[in-house]
UniProtKB/Swiss-Prot annotation:
Protein name as it appears in the record: Co-chaperonin GroES
Family recorded in the similarity comment: Belongs to the GroES chaperonin family.
Pfam families reported in the protein's UniProt record: Cpn10
Location(s), subcellular: Cytoplasm
Underlying gene: groES
Amino acid sequence: MSFKPLHDRIAIKPIENEEKTKGGIIIPDTAKEKPMQGEIVAVGNGVLNKNGEIYPLELKVGDKVLYGKWAGTEIEIKGEKLIVMKESDVFGIIN
């Protein structure tokens, strides 16, 4: 993949939810929730402050993160679905 987000944006590859419940019930596609966690695959350079200095982003490629259900914009590059959002739309890093 060759995609570089600009400024304070990040690209996330969503981690799909399970297709079965713990009890073994298969969840149809129409009933699945949108993923709310994913792995960061690309980050922008950071944000410019008033003095023209760049503040680098706290998140980095490889971080697994939790984000809002409706955050970001879905895109597709070379058949891979990604979500692009601002770093501030991420709730936190999953350890």
